[in-house]
Regions:
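Alpha-helical transmembrane segments of multi-pass membrane proteins predominantly involved
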Residues: 1-338
Length: 338
């Protein structure tokens, strides 16, 4: 194992260049803001350029190694799911920066790049430990961004979001412990070979349900959506548009990998009930709102439920490529509409 880890060819470090470059740029911006004062156009320009370079590195990796490459002992993947999700994340992050016309603090842009790098790490891995690291790193940055911009209630809404997500993170960690206890691995793709054992083991099925609790919180599915209305109302409008798309695309990748793991276990019945319940709650709650941002919050609940319904066939191994095309196609159109 140690020899494999020291083998640079097996490590395939180039797959990590896109998010390592963003992290390096974020550190540079953080240092610049600490010693000099620049206009926001400088921070926006550097941040936008770093996103473009990161997208180029992803395309270059896909061209040079294909969409089956792995890195760091197969903990990082360059599959079609991570490839498309990474480009969507970078594209709409770039559009968000173009809308940025008020923020002059370099710390804001450094945190933003840290968050995007963490999201890229999350979508590029099927290893539960790396997924959790990417998820929590991006979430901590997002909580801070929400608190930095918006109304007087932005800090309290960020704390509420943090509190709800912390509960979900606890479920996630407990589920990871159960999965490792039963399988001896943290790799969701490796666990696909254990489907027969998984179908008979209530501990592993329960672990899958606990992981999905965190996914439901991040996707703002009812009844885990209580944080969303306050965040949408208090956060800056541009940031609301960003929150409604980019973090959810990253979490959608985790759901896709999780559903592969939960294949043919009967888990789809739980998802169907949750999706229908979430649609109804979001639709009826939106009708009673007198604030447009709060109405959009419940609209986001409904959209997440629709995407969740599209993911259900993944639990039955039916036309995987067609399902992914429909899911990402819908979410991309929704993002442009936003």
């Amino acid at each position: 194992m140690l020899n494999n880890f020291l083998n640079l060819e097996l490590l395939n470090i180039s797959l990590s260049y896109p998010f390592l470059f963003l992290i390096t740029t974020a550190i540079v911006l953080l240092l610049c803001s600490g010693f000099w004062k620049f206009h926001r156009s400088f921070y926006i320009g550097i941040s936008s350029l770093s996103l473009i370079v990161s997208a180029f590195l992803i395309l270059n990796n896909a061209n040079a190694q294909g969409l089956e490459a792995k890195a760091f002992l197969a903990t990082l993947n360059n599959d079609i799911v991570s490839f498309y999700a990474s480009l969507v994340i970078l594209c709409f992050s770039f559009l968000y920066l173009l809308m940025q016309k008020e923020e002059n603090q370099g710390e804001f842009y450094a945190l933003f790049l840290f968050m995007i790098a963490s999201l890229l790490l999350m979508v590029s891995s099927s290893n539960l430990a790396l997924i959790f690291i990417g998820l929590e790193s991006s979430s901590l940055a997002l909580y801070t961004l929400i608190a930095m911009r918006g109304s007087d209630n932005a800090i309290s809404s960020a704390i509420k979001y943090f509190s709800v997500a912390a509960v979900g993170a606890g479920f996630f960690v407990m589920a990871v412990a159960f999965i490792y206890l039963k399988t001896g691995t943290l790799d969701l793709s490796a666990n696909l070979a254990l489907k027969n054992e998984f179908q008979k083991d209530p501990m592993l099925l329960g672990a899958g349900v606990m992981i999905f609790v965190l996914c439901a919180i991040k996707l703002s599915l009812a009844p885990f959506h209580f944080w969303l209305k306050d965040v949408y109302y208090a956060a800056h409008t541009n940031l609301v548009a960003f929150i409604s798309v980019v973090p959810k695309v990253a979490m959608l990748v985790v759901v896709i990998r999780l559903f592969d793991f939960l294949n043919n276990t009967g888990f789809e019945y739980i998802i169907i009930v949750l999706a229908i319940f979430s649609m109804l709650i979001g639709a009826f709650a939106a009708l009673s709102q007198n604030n447009i941002k709060k109405m959009f919050a419940y609209s986001s609940v409904v959209h997440s439920s629709l995407v969740l319904v599209a993911c259900i066939p993944l639990l039955k191994e039916q036309n995987f490529d067609g399902i992914l095309l429909a899911i990402f196609g819908y979410w991309t159109l929704f993002a442009f509409a936003n």
